[in-house]
């Protein structure tokens, strides 16, 4: 079952764009970024060329915002939802971005 879509039209105010509260009700986007609430999700993504979707409610398990395309050999295994083991967060995040959010963390450690 996929998560319900975020209805951003409810946050649009004519002529003034989107104004959000500071309520902490985090959601995780398919970009694996944690947004403080649905309104902030809509505000920060209104100018993106592709529609961003909600992955799930609550914080993302692993933040992939500052990943590098070039990874170290550090060994801190992560098990992905695909059953694959990734040697470290960098390698995991590269795969998350490549798959556009269809991969998520199953557990820390080996699969």
From Swiss-Prot:
InterPro entries: Bifunctional_prot_inhibitor, Kazal_dom, Kazal_dom_sf, Prot_inh_Kazal-m. The record marks 73-74 as: Reactive bond 2 for elastase. The keyword Disulfide bond applies. The record marks 22-23 as: Reactive bond 1 for trypsin. SMART domains: KAZAL. One of its GO terms (molecular function) is serine-type endopeptidase inhibitor activity. Its main location: secreted. GO terms for cellular component: extracellular region. SUPFAM superfamilies: Kazal-type serine protease inhibitors. The keyword Transport does not apply. PROSITE patterns: KAZAL_1, KAZAL_2. Pfam families: Kazal_1. Residues 2-62, 63-111 form the Kazal-like domain. It is found in: Secreted. Keywords: Disulfide bond, Protease inhibitor, Repeat, Secreted, Serine protease inhibitor. Disulfide bonds join 8-42, 20-39, 28-60, 64-93, 71-90, 79-111. This inhibitor is composed of two homologous actively inhibiting halves: one which inhibits trypsin, the other which inhibits elastase. This is Double-headed protease inhibitor, submandibular gland. It comes from Felis catus (Cat).
């Amino acid at each position: 079952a996929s998560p319900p879509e975020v209805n951003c039209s409810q946050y649009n105010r004519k002529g003034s764009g989107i104004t959000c509260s500071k309520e902490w009700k985090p959601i995780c986007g398919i970009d694996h970024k944690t947004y403080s609430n649905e309104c902030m999700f809509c505000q920060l993504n209104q100018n993106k060329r592709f529609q961003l979707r909600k992955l799930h409610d609550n914080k993302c398990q692993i933040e992939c915002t500052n990943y590098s395309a070039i990874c170290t050999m550090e060994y801190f295994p992560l098990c992905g939802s695909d059953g694959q083991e990734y040697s470290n967060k960098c390698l995991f995040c590269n795969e998350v971005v490549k798959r556009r959010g269809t991969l998520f963390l199953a557990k820390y450690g080996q699969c």
